Amino acid sequence: MNQVFKGWSRGMSTSRGRSMRSKVESRMRKESGKTLREIRRAKKLKKKLMTDEERLIYNLKRAKKKVALLLQKLKKYDLPELPSPVHDPELFTSEQVQAFKKIGFKNKNYVPVGVRGVFGGVVQNMHMHWKFHETVQVCCDNFPKEKIKEMASMIARLSGGVVINIHNVKTIIMFRGRNYRQPKNLIPVNTLTKRKALFKARFEQALESQKLNIKKTEQQLRRMGVNPEDPVAMASIHRVASTFFNAIDKKEGTPYVFHGDKQSERGTSVDNREESEPGDEDSDQEELDRFIAEIEEAADKEWEEEEAAEQEESGRIRYWNREEFAGRSRTPELRSYGDASHGFRRNDRDTHSQRRPNDSDDDDDDGELDSEDDEIPKRFDRARSSNTNTRRPREDFKRRSPDPRPRPRAQVRSDDDVLSDLDNTMWDSEDEEDAPPANYISSSDDDEDENRTVSASSSKQSRFRNNSSRDGINNSKSKSGKQRDEDWDSD
């Protein structure tokens, strides 16, 4: 086992007595390669070994690079200013301005301007307010005082309104004009979309923060005695800082470790670099040009990606219905009404299940709803058949069932349905006790029925009148309670 983990134990163990300089030297010798991975690790190690002045200078250069990149990105969002529309200048007297100002304070309608600034949506909302009001309040609470007048002039140019007053520094009262007519396109042509306005606001916010960061870093450098605007001082700091890294690149050792044989060589290399400073100016110019080209390329690439994302989002919003239903559009009203109709029928079945007779199943309600239209012609057919004297002898002895259609086959039901049937039978038994007894027809009423059929056949009136007369005879021939008891006993 010791032989197996021998290599691992050597790799994980560290020798005692090694100083920090020896560790840095060995690490820098390993990081002197030219591969991408080694270059990244070398840059990371450079940051760790920087002094305070070097770190501040590095942060200052990095912040200036970010500012250049943000300025290049913001150039993409600059829109050409269209010529202002030609209209009659509206001149107001002081009394008219005061009257419109009073109207603007009285009307509480307002349009907020958020982090996106003034874009097409703000102008559209103003036109929607001007449809019913003469004035509108534009609230610019997220912007500094210096930008309010600039925003007021921009809003007046895009909307065609008149600035009446700037109230409490952050609220602009806009008047629509005397001869105002709502334009056909509420969103002006030379305005940003909602998405692009948000990206522009983010870049402007990042630019302001980078400017503050640069100002703070320059103040810290001045406190240390270094003038950030002095090119000579900056060049000397860069020269001192680059001696260490140039020595590593040329594998001449490090300035932290003394090498007697290579000390003179290192001194001569520094002299050669001082002599070759004029040639370095050209390399700096080439590096600057390359940096500008990289910034422009990165800005163009990001703009193209943003345009593609915006087109994809607009297409998704426009055709979301087709994507969801695979090309078949279905309105939400139909979906809601369909679900509601099923729920209504289900609830109606549950509420009426307690009042049904015992011999009807739970699944018969749907059939009863469908068979309501079929019961009307059956009644008329029964009236026609009564004209002919072909009656079955024991037809009147049968109990009249509320549902004339045949009963379906018994289905297998779960335990819950069986329990619900037991509850229904209990309810029905109580209802039968409270309800009046049913009306039965006995054999003693055959003569009366024959007389009714003869009178019905002799009359030449309409079918509707026959039905009404038969109902009247049935109501007049109602039996007493004693006769119904006798009929029950005879059955």
Curated annotation (Swiss-Prot):
Compositionally biased residues, Acidic residues: 277-287, 360-375
Transmembrane segments: none
GO biological process: Group II intron splicing; mitochondrial polycistronic RNA processing; mRNA processing; response to abscisic acid; response to salt stress; response to water deprivation
Alphabetical list of PROSITE patterns matching this protein: CRM
Transit peptide feature range: 1-25
Biased composition (Basic and acidic residues): 22-34, 255-265, 345-359, 392-416
Biased composition (Polar residues): 453-478
GO molecular function list: RNA binding
SUPFAM superfamilies: YhbY-like (SSF75471)
Annotated compartments: Mitochondrion
Pfam entry (one): CRS1_YhbY
GO CC aspect terms: mitochondrion; ribonucleoprotein complex
Region (Disordered) location: 1-34, 255-287, 328-491
Gene deletion effect: Delayed seed germination, retarded growth and reduced size and height.
Claim: RNA-binding is one of the keywords in the record: yes
Tissue: Highly expressed in roots and meristemic regions of young seedlings. Expressed at low levels in stems, trichomes and stigma.
UniProt superkingdom: Eukaryota
UniProt entry keywords in alphabetical sequence: Mitochondrion, mRNA processing, mRNA splicing, Ribonucleoprotein, RNA-binding, Transit peptide
InterPro entries: At3g25440-like, RNA-binding_CRM, YhbY-like_sf
Domain CRM: start-end pairs: 90-187
Major localization class: mitochondrion
Cited PANTHER family: CRM-DOMAIN CONTAINING FACTOR CFM9, MITOCHONDRIAL, GROUP II INTRON SPLICING FACTOR CRS1-LIKE
Function description: Involved in the splicing of group II introns in mitochondria. Required for the splicing of mitochondrial introns found in nad1, nad2, nad4, nad5, nad7, rps3 and cox2 genes. Splicing of mitochondrial introns is crucial for mitochondrial biogenesis and function, plant growth and development, and plant response to abiotic stresses.
Protein name: CRM-domain containing factor CFM9, mitochondrial
